[in-house]
């Protein structure tokens, strides 16, 4: 059987990488190991006004090569051990679940979620993150500095991401990238937040990078809505939006939830450093 090693999966968005451990060969020499390594990480783009966004994961599932392959928290060695961040309504720890605070892994930071998993070579139609119960966001609802834990739910308890191809002998590294400003909503009339798949994408680490820079104070001063020197340096002073393509007219560029033609690919906040610089990383 041709196989690939699914080496490492990380979340914070989520990154995964696939490495070729051995050269691929079409002969029947069983001494040639046709495997690939898959790594997955998780990472996030920050969300406004939240102190924590803890998402509870139960498993990673790969589909497209016969029966789905599932790696379950607390059962399989390729995924991290369960922790005590996910609790039910009685305060009891939910078994076989790991809670990850996405706000701890923003920008280029990530946490490992799947490591050294051996999978059959071939095309995989989807990577699914199977969610557990107990996800929540800690937010300041009244602006008084006190946070409240608000439930976060995921439709169908699964985040279905794009697929990938595992070549025999390959080593893949991917990230499941969460953009909570796009994917987490608080519908009117409903309790809690909803985390939608549109705010999560599977990214090949070998083909992406991160941008960082600063915004001029003059530009911010020209925008009357920007508070350029907040007392709390964790308060964003502005936001940066990244779009796919070039040459667009400014009037065609939408912000998060806007109706204009060109929707942002990603976004991030700009922060004042307390001295003279306004910095961002995306």
Briefly describe each language-model feature range.
Residues 1-11:
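Bacterial N-terminal signal peptides that target proteins for export
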Residues 13-16:
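Short, linear, compositionally biased motifs with a strong N-terminal bias
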Residues 18-21:
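C-terminal motif of bacterial Sec signal peptides marking the signal peptidase cleavage site
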Residues 23-281:
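A short, solvent-exposed, low-complexity linear motif enriched for acidic/polar residues
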């Amino acid at each position: 059987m041709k196989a690939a090693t699914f080496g490492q999966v990380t979340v914070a968005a989520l990154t995964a990488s696939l490495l070729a451990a051995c050269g691929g060969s079409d002969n029947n020499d069983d001494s040639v190991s046709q495997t690939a390594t898959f790594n997955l990480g998780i990472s996030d783009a920050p969300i406004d006004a939240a102190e924590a966004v803890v998402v509870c994961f139960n498993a990673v599932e790969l589909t497209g090569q016969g029966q789905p392959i599932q790696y379950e928290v607390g059962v399989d060695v390729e995924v991290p051990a369960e922790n005590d961040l996910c609790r039910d309504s009685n305060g009891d720890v939910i078994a076989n679940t790991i809670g990850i605070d996405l706000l701890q892994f923003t920008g280029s930071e990530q946490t490992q979620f799947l490591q050294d998993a051996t999978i059959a070579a071939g095309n995989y139609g989807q990577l699914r993150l199977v969610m557990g119960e107990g996800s929540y966001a800690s937010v300041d609802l009244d602006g008084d500095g006190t946070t409240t834990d608000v439930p976060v739910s995921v439709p169908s308890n699964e985040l279905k991401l794009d697929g990938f191809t595992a070549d025999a002998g390959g080593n893949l590294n991917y990230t499941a990238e969460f953009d909570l400003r796009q994917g987490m909503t608080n519908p009117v009339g409903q309790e809690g937040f909803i985390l939608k798949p549109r705010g999560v994408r599977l990214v090949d680490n070998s083909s992406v990078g991160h941008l960082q820079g600063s915004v001029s104070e003059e530009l911010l001063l020209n925008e009357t809505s920007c508070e350029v020197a907040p007392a709390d340096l964790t308060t964003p002073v502005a936001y940066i939006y990244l779009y796919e393509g070039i040459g667009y007219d400014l009037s065609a560029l939408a912000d998060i939830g806007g109706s204009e033609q060109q929707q942002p690919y990603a976004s991030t906040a700009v922060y004042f450093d307390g001295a003279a610089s306004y910095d961002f990383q995306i």
